[in-house]
Structure formats: structure tokens, C-alpha cells
């Protein structure tokens, strides 16, 4: 699978027309809306709205000035607007199943959980301090499946790890991980990511090698 999702802006607009009706979806038999099952009085109730976006960015949504290195180094949750999208190029260090989260109504079914892709600048800089998390969500995965594109965790794992890619999607700052990110907790012994900045959800992936 050389090109997972070609013709960037054309297909963004094409797929946008197919992304209606995703406010509430069935995850393992559970009707899960864009807030997931978060408590309305908790911060994740609002944050889940951003995690569960399913509209595809159009050209005017993109901030071409934001780079992968910017996301790696930023510990400032206000540095970038999360209503903007980015296009990034990097090396895929790892692909794995996301955890059990309120955004997906705490489903344990792997088919309905996020896919975490660990993106680094290149194959020489793959330590946790360089890893930016970019995520495929169940809603976007479903839209892709309708178009005949397989964005399951297993498919992405088998095709992306060890390759250079171009990805695009919405910016997100996942404040829940401040204690595990080098940009906000430089001395953390259990850090596993560069910063809290993510691309979440991803709406485009293309293999470059």
C-alpha cells in the first residue's frame, strides 16, 4: 500500500461530504456521542468534542507555519489554536492501540478505540522526547472504511512503522498527559511523549518511501 490517502485537498473536500451523521455512533453496541461518557462537570467533557471531530479540514483551516518540531518543543497549551489543522512530515516509530478512554465511552473493544501513531522527525531521533502522538479515531476510521480505506490499528501498524509519512489533521492539546511529556515535565521518569500537542484526529496519511 504505497499511498494510503492521495490527492490531499481534493479528497479532503470529497470525504467531507461523506462525514455527516457521526455525532452519535455505536461503539460495541453503545450509543456514544461526541462527549463520550465523560461527566459534564469534568474538563474531558469539552475536550472530547475536539477528539471526536469528524469534519475534514478545508484549505483555509490549515496553518502551514506549524511544524513537527514546534509540537515537539511546546509546553504552552495556548501556543497554537486547536481549531486549526496541520500537515506534518515525519518518521513512524510505532503504532499501537489507544487506551480505554471516556471519548470512546470506555469501550474495551479494540475495533472502537483510537490508534496512536508515534511520529518523530526521522529515524535517528526516536526517543520519547521526540515522539508526537497523532491519532486515528473510530469516527474517522468508519468514514475511511466507507471509502474502502482500511485504517484499522493492525493495518496501520503493518504498513506505517519504519516509514516516512505525511499526515494531516486537527491540532489538539491533551492536557491529561502533562506529567508524561518532556515539554511540561522535563525530569519525568515515566515520560513517553514529547509534549501534550497532538494531531487528533488524523484525516490524511500518505507513505513517502
Q: Residue spans of the language-model regions?
A:
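C-terminal motif of bacterial Sec signal peptides marking the signal peptidase cleavage site
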Residues: 16-17
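Positively charged n-region of N-terminal signal peptides that target proteins for export
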Residues: 1-4
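OB-fold and OB-like single-stranded nucleic-acid-recognition modules
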Residues: 21-209
Amino acid at each position: 500500500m504505497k499511498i494510503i490517502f492521495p490527492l490531499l485537498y481534493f479528497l479532503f473536500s470529497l470525504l467531507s461530504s461523506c462525514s455527516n451523521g457521526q455525532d452519535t455512533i455505536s461503539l460495541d453496541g453503545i450509543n456514544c456521542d461526541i462527549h463520550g461518557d465523560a461527566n459534564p462537570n469534568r474538563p474531558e467533557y469539552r475536550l472530547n468534542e475536539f477528539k471526536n471531530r469528524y469534519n475534514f479540514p478545508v484549505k483555509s483551516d490549515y496553518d502551514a507555519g506549524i511544524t513537527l518540531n514546534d509540537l515537539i518543543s511546546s509546553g504552552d497549551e495556548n501556543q497554537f489554536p486547536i481549531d486549526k489543522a496541520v500537515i506534518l512530515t515525519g518518521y513512524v516509530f510505532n503504532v499501537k492501540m489507544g487506551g480505554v478512554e471516556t471519548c470512546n465511552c470506555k469501550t474495551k473493544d479494540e475495533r472502537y478505540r483510537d490508534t496512536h501513531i508515534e511520529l518523530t522527525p526521522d529515524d535517528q531521533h526516536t526517543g520519547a522526547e521526540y515522539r508526537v502522538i497523532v491519532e486515528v479515531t473510530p469516527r474517522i476510521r468508519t468514514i475511511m472504511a466507507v471509502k474502502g480505506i482500511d485504517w484499522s490499528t493492525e493495518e496501520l501498524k503493518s504498513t506505517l512503522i519504519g516509514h516516512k509519512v505525511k499526515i494531516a489533521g486537527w491540532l489538539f492539546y491533551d492536557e491529561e498527559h502533562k506529567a508524561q511529556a518532556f515539554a511540561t515535565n522535563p525530569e519525568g521518569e515515566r515520560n513517553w511523549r514529547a509534549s501534550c500537542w497532538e494531531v487528533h484526529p488524523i484525516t490524511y496519511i500518505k507513505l513517502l518511501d
